[in-house]
């Protein structure tokens, strides 16, 4: 019967088309404006009214008990075939997983204009089994409750009344008989006649092209004007989260899980608390103390970088909650942690990053406003406690993967005002409101290991004098370590490793780490606060944001390119305090490093200039250390560190000359025909060619650096780096060849000529103190694999680090920008054309002929009188730029002349063949050895202290385990039960001892497996 009904309906439609095309005068319809349509009016005029179908025309409407708010549309035959099988009544309510079981973006309900053939999204992997959708139903506010909160009422709708809820019963959907026919576009059918084609108006305009492809089951959000009560004159909204997100949340017992809070902030971050703004952690049932405040700053990074960092933070929060025996943390430890995500510029944020935030429930489109109560909005603050996480593969992770709730604050700044301003929002606005104990700073793209944040927090918990802590930054080597095939990535991997093995431990022993990396660092919030007069670390830290005009001299501007170094110095040198900085090697974070030459040079320009000027600042102000409350021993150590930094600064400044002189004396030793390894005096010719090539590239380097950006001169910089690598390789070959000759002579072999004992000792000591100590300390820290995979690339690019990077940095000291920020000011001095109605605008213009004539007369009078036009002068910004460039020129000239004079003087005093009596070469080699030995001593001291600390902690845990075991045994004896089998007399049962042994073995294997590092 259903098949016959379907064929009859299709024949009816075909008959209607044929009849209408042949007899158009019989088929004229009148439009009834009182008729209620469930959809938008069709583009064709005189649309017919079609009564509802009979029982034979379509199946009766069926409602599903489990989805009362999403009824399915009735099935009806299509025009493409005689008969189509209707959908099965037992069809599943869940479709296949999109990627990993994550919910589809569409709303599969006819209530929202969705497709009737689109089933419901799949059940998430972490949804509770056995629960139905009735348990997760929430009211979306059909006139009863406003989803935006505040009890506002709808004023008007942009789209007018909508009837999509009743679309499945609309009278305009079905055909009752042959007299009530649907008017259709006849161009869609092949059987239409030429007469029918002539009915179509060729000039008919269908409107503009759609901006994007329409998706089945997805409808655009429909906006409506509402009245919302302002809170203290500010806009604060409580918005319901999406229904599909709410449906699979494990916890829905509090408003922080079911509503997202939006606040439009119209003040400066320094006035956030004074203006009465409050966060969720300060109001109502969510009023809590904040122990850990995590800041994630981002600019325009995509969703992959964001989810990598955010998922790592969520894993760390889960680790905090897993420490059930901790006095601070435990099952509800997430309530003491707040994650603050700050995006620098609403126009700069990546759209897919906003999509990732929306998937977590933190962000909703269409809520933010530019102006509130005639005040411009400076930041949009979204607050939500999310219970799901997205990993870097965009797969949802929930409670089944150990993810716990996370309190998130998303601050979307209206304008791009650089990273320093983002930190001002974090510390001065949200930090003052929450008053946290510890603040952790992260950059988007850095993936902290699951226990990294706990180890950072533990450093503050164990020592009350710690004001800041730095984690170990590890370079990302790509999948299967394929990134090491890129020499840039490999050299940076070696540099990061040796810095974490030699430099950071040494500075940690002294108590002053020159820089806490913004990618992974932590601060004690109390230590950062200013004094009563407003002077202190934060005041100095944020001074770089407000430098303008005469105050922004080149030295200060470049110094604040590395403002985190200034903050570290101000903490250690804080008056009448005894704060120290620590390096936490167990807090590891992985970050991406530049893999292209332009990106690499641009990054190091800011690092080198900031580090150089910040080091000068700390050395000049070293006397501030004597006004602190440090012990005498600590003050002496800090003075020694200042001397060490001064030596490093001198070597950095004369790096060009020292590199050239080392090549000149070592490679020049092979110009003697007696020890020429190539014969025919080839050693001399090779030395001459490489010498002039090296000098030529150094000269060209200044032209490249002053006249070209790295992005526009990639091949030039690549060529110079290749030449430097060849020079370095030949110098290394000459060094090894001379050492082999000397060793052969000392063992009795007949060699034509030997080095002097002094030169031999100098070279050997220098090599052993660098390469030898690199191997020794790497094996001491059980992390030697970078010596085999990345050391060759690093030493090959070492001249480029010294020459190319340093030259580009000094030649661009006038560039003190972090990025580009355009001028977004709109000038209104000419007036505006205000739209009145449609294409009619209101403008100001001369209204009478007399006004036009007076303007003409004024022009003629000015020509006759020859009035002098006042000179506008040079703008302040142009004066500042000229000043920066002039100082840059003086600075580069002095630096270049100093290096050239040093190289020429030493090379003239000591010739090529006088290496044995070369005092300057001996000073250079022994200075390198002394500095390397100091670093090795500091690294060894840090390792010893770290080992002692772990032994003390292990002993304390062991004793606590003995006490707990004794108490358990006593309790078991009193109850007449037998306790666990003990292992020896140590108080540990067999199971605990086996578990501890397994853990120790596993930990050792993880450290030994280089492919996981």
From Swiss-Prot:
Mainly expressed in the metulae, phialides, and conidia. It is an enzyme of class 2 (transferase). Its EC number is 2.4.1.16. InterPro entries: Chitin_synth, Chitin_synth_fun, Chitin_synth_N, Nucleotide-diphossugar_trans. Pfam families: Chitin_synth_1, Chitin_synth_1N. GO terms for molecular function: chitin synthase activity. Residues 26-83, 95-218 are annotated as: Disordered. Disulfide bonds: none annotated. Induction: Expressed specifically during asexual differentiation but not during either vegetative growth or sexual differentiation. Expression is stimulated by osmostress. Disruption phenotype: Does not affect hyphal growth. Leads to a remarkable decrease in the efficiency of conidia formation. Exhibits growth defects on media supplemented with sodium dodecyl sulfate (SDS), high concentration of salts, chitin-binding dyes, or chitin synthase competitive inhibitors, when chsC is also deleted. Its main location: membrane. The chain crosses the membrane at residues 646-666, 686-706, 721-741, 759-779, 792-811, 892-912, 919-939. Keywords: Cell membrane, Cell wall biogenesis/degradation, Glycoprotein, Glycosyltransferase, Membrane, Transferase, Transmembrane, Transmembrane helix. Residues 154-173 have a biased composition (Polar residues). Glycans are attached at residues 10, 194, 316, 837, 967, 980, 989, 995. SUPFAM superfamilies: Nucleotide-diphospho-sugar transferases (SSF53448). One of its GO terms (biological process) is division septum site selection. Residues 64-81 have a biased composition (Low complexity). Polymerizes chitin, a structural polymer of the cell wall and septum, by transferring the sugar moiety of UDP-GlcNAc to the non-reducing end of the growing chitin polymer. Seems not to be involved in hyphal growth, but, with chsC, chsA shares critical functions in hyphal wall integrity and differentiation. ChsA and chsC share also overlapping roles in septum formation. Invoved in the production of the asexual spores (conidia) that are formed by differentiated aerial hyphae called conidiophores. Belongs to the chitin synthase family. Class II subfamily. This is Chitin synthase A. The gene is chsA.
């Amino acid at each position: 019967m259903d098949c016959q009904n379907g064929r009859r309906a299709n024949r009816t439609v075909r008959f209607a088309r044929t009849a209408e095309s042949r007899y158009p005068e019989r088929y004229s319809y009148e439009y009834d404006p009182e008729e209620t349509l469930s959809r938008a009016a069709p583009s064709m005029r005189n649309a017919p009214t079609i009564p509802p179908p009979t029982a034979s025309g379509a199946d009766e409407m069926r409602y599903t008990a489990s989805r009362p708010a999403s009824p399915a549309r009735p099935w009806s035959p299509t025009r493409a075939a005689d008969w189509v099988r209707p959908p099965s009544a037992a069809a599943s309510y869940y479709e296949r997983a999109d990627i990993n079981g994550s919910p589809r973006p569409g709303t599969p309900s006819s209530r929202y204009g969705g497709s009737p053939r689109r089933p419901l999204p799949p059940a998430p992997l972490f949804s509770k089994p056995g629960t139905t959708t009735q348990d997760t139903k929430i009211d979306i506010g059909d006139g009863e409750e406003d989803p935006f909160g505040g009890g506002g009422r709808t004023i008007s709708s942009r789209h007018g009344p909508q009837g999509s809820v009743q679309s499945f019963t609309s009278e305009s959907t079905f055909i009752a008989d042959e007299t009530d026919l649907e008017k259709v576009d006849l161009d869609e059918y092949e059987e239409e006649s030429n007469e029918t084609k002539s009915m179509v108006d060729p000039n008919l305009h269908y409107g503009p092209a759609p901006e994007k492809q329409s998706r089945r089951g997805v409808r655009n959000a429909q906006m409506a004007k509402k009245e919302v009560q302002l809170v203290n004159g500010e806009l604060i909204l409580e918005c319901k989260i999406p229904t599909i997100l709410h449906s699979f949340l494990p916890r829905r017992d509090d408003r922080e899980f079911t509503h997202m809070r939006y606040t439009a902030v119209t003040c400066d971050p320094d006035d956030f608390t004074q203006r009465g703004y409050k966060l969720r952690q300060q109001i109502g049932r969510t009023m809590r103390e904040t122990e850990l405040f995590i800041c994630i700053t981002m600019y325009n990074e995509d969703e992959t970088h964001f989810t990598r960092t955010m998922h790592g933070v969520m894993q760390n929060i889960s680790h905090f909650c897993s420490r059930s025996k901790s006095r601070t943390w435990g099952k509800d430890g997430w309530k003491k942690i707040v994650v603050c995500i700050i995006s620098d510029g609403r126009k700069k944020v990546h759209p897919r990053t906003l999509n990732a935030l929306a998937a977590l429930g933190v962000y909703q489109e269409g809520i933010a406003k530019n102006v509130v109560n005639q005040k411009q909005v400076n930041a949009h603050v979204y607050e939500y406690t999310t219970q799901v996480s997205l990993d870097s593969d965009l797969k949802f992770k929930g409670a089944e993967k150990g993810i716990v709730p996370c309190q998130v604050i998303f601050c979307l700044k209206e304008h791009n005002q650089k990273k320093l301003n983002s930190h001002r929002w974090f510390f001065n606005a949200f930090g003052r409101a929450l008053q946290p104990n510890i603040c952790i700073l992260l950059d988007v793209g850095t993936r902290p290991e699951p226990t990294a944040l706990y180890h950072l927090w533990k450093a503050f918990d164990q020592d009350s004098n710690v004001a800041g802590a730095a984690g170990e930054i590890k370079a990302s080597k790509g999948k299967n370590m394929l990134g090491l095939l890129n020499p840039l990535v490999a050299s940076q991997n070696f540099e990061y490793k040796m810095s974490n093995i030699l430099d950071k431990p040494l500075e940690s022993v002294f108590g002053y780490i020159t820089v806490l990396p913004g990618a992974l660092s932590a601060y004690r919030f109390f230590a950062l606060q200013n004094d009563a007069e407003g002077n202190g670390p934060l005041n100095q830290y944020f001074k770089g944001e407000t430098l303008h005009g005469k105050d922004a001299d080149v030295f200060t501007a470049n110094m604040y390119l590395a403002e985190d170094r200034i903050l570290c110095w101000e903490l250690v040198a804080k008056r009448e305090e005894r704060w120290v900085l620590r390096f936490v090697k167990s807090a590891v974070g992985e970050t991406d490093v530049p893999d292209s030459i332009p990106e690499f040079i641009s990054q190091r320009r800011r690092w080198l200039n900031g580090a150089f000027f910040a080091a000068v600042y700390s050395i000049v102000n070293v006397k501030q250390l004597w006004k602190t409350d440090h012990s005498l021993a600590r003050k002496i150590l800090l003075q020694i560190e200042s001397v060490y930094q001064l030596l490093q600064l001198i070597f950095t400044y004369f790096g060009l000359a020292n590199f050239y002189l080392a090549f000149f004396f070592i490679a020049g030793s092979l110009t003697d025909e007696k020890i020429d390894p190539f014969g025919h005096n080839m050693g001399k010719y090779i030395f001459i060619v490489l010498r002039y090539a090296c000098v030529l590239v150094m000269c060209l380097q200044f032209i490249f650096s002053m006249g070209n950006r790295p992005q526009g001169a990639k091949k030039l910089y690549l060529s110079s780096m290749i030449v430097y690598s060849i020079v370095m390789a030949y110098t290394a070959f000459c060094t090894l060849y001379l050492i082999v000759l000397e060793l052969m002579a000392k063992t009795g072999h007949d060699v034509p000529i030997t080095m002097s004992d002094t030169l031999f000792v100098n070279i050997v000591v220098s090599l052993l103190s660098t390469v030898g100590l690199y191997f020794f300390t790497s094996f001491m820290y059980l992390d030697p694999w970078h010596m085999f995979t990345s050391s060759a690339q690093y030493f090959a690019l070492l001249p480029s680090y010294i020459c190319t990077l340093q030259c580009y940095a000094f030649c661009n000291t006038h560039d003190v920008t972090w990025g580009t920020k355009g001028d977004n000011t709109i000038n209104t001095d000419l007036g505006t054309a205000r739209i009145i109605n449609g294409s009619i605008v209101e403008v100001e213009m001369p209204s009478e002929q007399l006004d036009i004539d007076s303007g003409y007369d004024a022009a003629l009078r000015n020509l006759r009188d020859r009035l002098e036009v006042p000179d506008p002068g040079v703008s302040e910004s142009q004066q500042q730029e000229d000043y920066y460039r002039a100082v840059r020129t003086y600075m580069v000239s002095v630096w270049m002349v100093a290096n050239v004079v040093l190289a020429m003087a030493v090379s003239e005093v000591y010739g090529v063949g006088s290496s044995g009596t070369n005092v300057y070469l001996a000073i250079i080699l022994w200075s390198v050895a002394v500095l390397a030995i100091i670093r090795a001593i500091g690294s060894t001291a840090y390792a010893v202290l770290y080992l002692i600390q772990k032994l003390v902690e292990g002993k304390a845990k062991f004793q606590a385990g003995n006490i707990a075991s004794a108490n358990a045994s006593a309790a078991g004896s009193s109850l007449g039960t037998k306790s666990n089998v003990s292992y020896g007399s140590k108080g540990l049962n067999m199971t605990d001892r086996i578990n501890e042994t397994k853990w120790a073995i596993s930990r050792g294997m993880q450290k030994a497996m280089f492919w996981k590092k």
